[in-house]
From Swiss-Prot:
Keywords of the record: Chloroplast, Membrane, NAD, NADP, Plastid, Plastoquinone, Quinone, Thylakoid, Translocase, Transmembrane, Transmembrane helix
Pfam families per the UniProt record, alphabetical: Proton_antipo_M
E.C. numbers: 7.1.1.-
One GO biological process term: electron transport coupled proton transport
Name of this protein: NAD(P)H-quinone oxidoreductase chain 4, chloroplastic
Transmembrane stretches, start-end: 4-24, 37-57, 80-100, 113-130, 134-154, 167-187, 208-228, 242-262, 272-292, 305-325, 330-350, 386-406, 416-436, 462-482
GN (gene name): ndhD
NCBIfam families membership: NDH_I_M
GO molecular function ontology, one term from the record: ubiquinone binding
Catalytic activity of the protein: a plastoquinone + NADH + (n+1) H(+)(in) = a plastoquinol + NAD(+) + n H(+)(out); a plastoquinone + NADPH + (n+1) H(+)(in) = a plastoquinol + NADP(+) + n H(+)(out)
Membrane topology term: Multi-pass membrane protein
Family to which the UniProt record says this protein belongs: Belongs to the complex I subunit 4 family.
InterPro entries with a match to the protein in the record: NADH_Q_OxRdtase_chain4, NADH_Q_OxRdtase_chainM/4, NADH_UbQ_OxRdtase, ND/Mrp_TM
Compartments (UniProt record): Plastid, Chloroplast thylakoid membrane
Length: 500
């Protein structure tokens, strides 16, 4: 137990401060926007302070633990704690949410509700990454759904209600399996529920039951991550959502599924994970090729970027299913890396749409001359997406490759085959990425359009993009900055597989 309730403050602060937005003076949106940005900044600085001064990197155990008895009736606790696995996603959440809030400047309709929902999402995400209780994990998982649904259905495009309904049906359907898994694991073997992660990690199950639990959790994470074939909500959602919502979806929401896969399926159900991992490896490999090929055929700019996100999630799945130090560390690095790259690409797609009012790539062309700053930044992030050496994506994918090659679990032939197919996926990535840049920025098509409203990126947008670009290059040059956070925890998780 920590001396001071740092994590509770970090989790509760955004939603508590968000509920005070209603008390702000009715003088336009500026006050609300700056208030929200200040809350996000303060939260990010507080989180960074706590991690710098109250967290030991070389300790793989849970730190800053807090445990309050919440509901006596069935022994439900408010149980929080962080380790090397959760520290990266929490800092990523703070960083991306702060930038997404400042990106939401064009939102003027119902801006109070919009900013409150963003802060509510912030609390839910940090709560999920720091929860140490299975039921609390589920509650935080569900807390995300309502803000995202409202952000989609109220501030989306023309088909926003369709995409919002599709999102809620998919994710709520997945959550049913998550709840069944939570209750099954919590109630197994006794009348008293056992929901503490530490207790559950030492619990053994019959193999058949463990597989059922694993499969239930896997479906919930497959929807959120997404893993094919449960990915079809994602392109529609990204295609219609406002770009600040897209930044949160691509940067953080998709990473919750991958985090859950490591935190619950790998850590609490190691035998089932060992059985499922070859199948996950096959699905991840197919996903890289399928999503990259499908992305190439998309006319809608945001849908093309959405499919590229699905393709990149394939690398994370492969890293997790390799069951090696390098593979799992690479997957965690890819979670952080793609959080930055995905958020930046959706922000650029949204700001471009604000100016040219065109969604489809075949209607665009020649923007490079009219908007050189947007062209430069888009090219930079496209290069980051296709894993250019010196940027974070390259290191993450390289470490995942190393993880597969060194994995003792798989035969040499299967490792060569998987590596070969992944390499084809890495060749397809620059094809759809560079063809997207070519269709948008080169040619002469838009010179015929009256271009009085073609204004290049302003200082605010350039600032947001540079804030995202710097960590991408920083991680690419010195990946140990992120890897050092998780390396001890990864060893602790994998000890279940080699000594358990």
């Amino acid at each position: 137990m920590s001396d001071f309730y740092w994590l509770t403050i970090i989790v509760v602060l955004p939603i508590s401060a968000g509920s005070l937005i209603a008390l702000l003076p009715h003088r336009g949106n500026k006050v609300v926007r700056w208030y929200t940005i200040c809350i996000c900044l303060f939260e990010l600085l507080l989180t960074t302070y706590v991690f710098c001064y109250h967290f030991q990197l070389d300790d793989p155990l849970i730190q800053l633990e807090e445990d309050f008895n919440w509901i006596n009736l069935f022994d439900f606790h408010w149980r929080l704690g962080i380790d090397g696995l959760s520290i990266g996603p929490i800092l990523l959440t703070g960083f991306i949410t702060t930038l997404a809030t400042s990106a939401a400047r064009p939102v003027t309709r119902n801006s109070r509700l919009f900013h409150f929902l963003m802060l509510a999402m912030y609390s839910g995400q940090i709560g999920l990454f720091s929860s140490r209780d299975l039921l609390l994990f589920f509650i935080m998982w569900e807390l995300e759904l309502i803000p995202v649904y409202l952000l989609l259905s109220m501030w989306g495009g023309k088909k926003r209600l369709y995409s919002a309904t599709k999102f809620i049906l998919y994710t709520a359907g997945g959550s049913i399996f998550l709840l069944m898994g939570v209750l099954g694991m919590g109630l197994y073997g006794s009348n008293e529920p056992k929901l503490n992660f530490e207790t559950l990690a030492n619990q053994s199950y019959p193999v058949a039951l463990e597989i059922i639990f694993y499969f239930g959790f896997l479906i919930a994470y497959a929807v959120k991550s997404p893993i094919i074939p449960l990915h079809t909500w994602l392109p529609d959602t990204h295609g219609e959502a406002h770009y600040s919502t897209c930044m949160l979806l691509a940067g953080i929401l998709l990473k919750m599924g991958a985090y859950g896969l490591v935190r619950i399926n790998m850590e609490l159900l190691p035998h089932a994970h060992s059985i499922f991992s070859p199948w996950l490896m096959i699905v991840g490999t197919i996903q890289i090729i399928y999503a990259a090929s499908t992305s190439l055929g998309q006319r809608n700019l945001k849908k093309r970027i959405a499919y590229s996100s699905v393709s990149h999630m394939g690398f994370i799945i492969i890293g997790i299913s390799s069951i090696t130090d390098a593979g799992l560390n690479g997957a965690i690095l890819q979670i952080i890396s793609h959080g930055f790259i995905g958020a930046a690409l959706f922000f650029l797609a949204g700001t471009s749409y604000d100016r040219i009012r065109l969604r489809y790539l075949n209607e665009m062309g020649g923007i490079a001359i009219l908007m050189p700053r947007i062209f430069t930044m888009f090219s930079s992030f496209s290069m980051a997406s296709l894993a250019l050496p010196g940027m974070s994506g390259f290191v993450a994918e390289l470490v995942i490759f190393l993880g597969i090659i060194t994995s003792p679990k798989y035969l040499v032939v299967s490792k060569i085959l998987i590596t070969f197919v992944m390499a084809i996926g890495m060749i397809l990535t620059p094809i759809y990425s560079l063809s997207m840049s070519r269709q948008m920025f080169y040619g002469y098509r838009l010179f015929n359009v009256p271009n009085s409203y073609f204004v290049d990126s302003g200082p605010r947008e350039i600032f947001i993009l540079i804030c995202i670009l710097l960590p991408i290059i920083g991680i690419g040059i010195y990946p140990d900055f992120v890897l050092s956070l998780s390396v001890d925890k990864v060893e602790a998780i994998l000890s279940n597989y080699f000594h358990g």
